[in-house]
């Protein structure tokens, strides 16, 4: 990645156990039932010699072990394995039949019980979300929202991915009115074209010429599905999607560079490289917009790239090393 300046900022690491740590199927299977038995068997009769006691206390039979098979709620296979394990234990240890039979009945009843969890209500989620925003933010900061009612004058234009995990307002703590944000698959900026991808062109034009933003940021992120698609879709031949393949090929030069320089590298590592290189391609594409070049030449606009790694909780920011000169006539 060719950069004039680059720095990495460590940010607090927020770990989501449900998304970052998943048990594998193999580990789930092996952990379905774990029971360890220690059995001491001896034959005795009324005429047998009493056992020699370590302590002068009566000898009682060891209590039956507590057997607690575990299974996951998202499939029947683990449940069936738990039952099979109990049945196998019955064959080997017949004296535990009452305990195992009770546990089988309990497991079966729990598996058959209806799910009491309330179904997700999207309308209620939207309503409660707005109520929370209004009571905690809108009502508590009237000066800000009174000012926003008069208009907007953001300093930043941000291109970010549509991925639900990388909202720039949360990641960079943007407040309302601070950033004019465009989100699309893989945070890409296509070259200037009046007839194709006009939605992006309109956003850039509005941000630069009307809002007078001072910075344009293009921010990539870790584990981007759009970039993985770019790296795995065939460069030629029929498409398997209606829109996605054409769109991500906006940054095909990034893929070509990564493959040429890191051929043989594992796909996951290539994707990380391409996530950043695609940002550089988008920054280069911004230079094809005449009003962007004018802003750079007049020092009223700057372009920067970034990469948010939500796995490790880091953020990188850089500026491309490029120069613009005024045209000359011959």
UniProtKB/Swiss-Prot annotation:
<comment type="similarity">
    <text>Belongs to the beta-class carbonic anhydrase family.</text>
</comment>
<dbReference type="InterPro" id="IPR015892">
    <property type="entry name" value="Carbonic_anhydrase_CS"/>
</dbReference>
<dbReference type="InterPro" id="IPR001765">
    <property type="entry name" value="Carbonic_anhydrase"/>
</dbReference>
<comment type="function">
    <text>Reversible hydration of carbon dioxide.</text>
</comment>
<protein>
    <recommendedName>
        <fullName>Carbonic anhydrase</fullName>
        <ecNumber>4.2.1.1</ecNumber>
    </recommendedName>
</protein>
<dbReference type="GO" id="GO:0015976">
    <property type="term" value="P:carbon utilization"/>
</dbReference>
<keyword id="KW-0963">Cytoplasm</keyword>
<keyword id="KW-0456">Lyase</keyword>
<dbReference type="InterPro" id="IPR036874">
    <property type="entry name" value="Carbonic_anhydrase_sf"/>
</dbReference>
<dbReference type="InterPro" id="IPR045066">
    <property type="entry name" value="Beta_CA_cladeB"/>
</dbReference>
<dbReference type="GO" id="GO:0005737">
    <property type="term" value="C:cytoplasm"/>
</dbReference>
<dbReference type="GO" id="GO:0008270">
    <property type="term" value="F:zinc ion binding"/>
</dbReference>
<feature type="region of interest" description="Chloroplast transit peptide-like">
    <location>
        <begin position="1"/>
        <end position="109"/>
    </location>
</feature>
<keyword id="KW-0862">Zinc</keyword>
<dbReference type="Pfam" id="PF00484">
    <property type="entry name" value="Pro_CA"/>
</dbReference>
<dbReference type="GO" id="GO:0004089">
    <property type="term" value="F:carbonate dehydratase activity"/>
</dbReference>
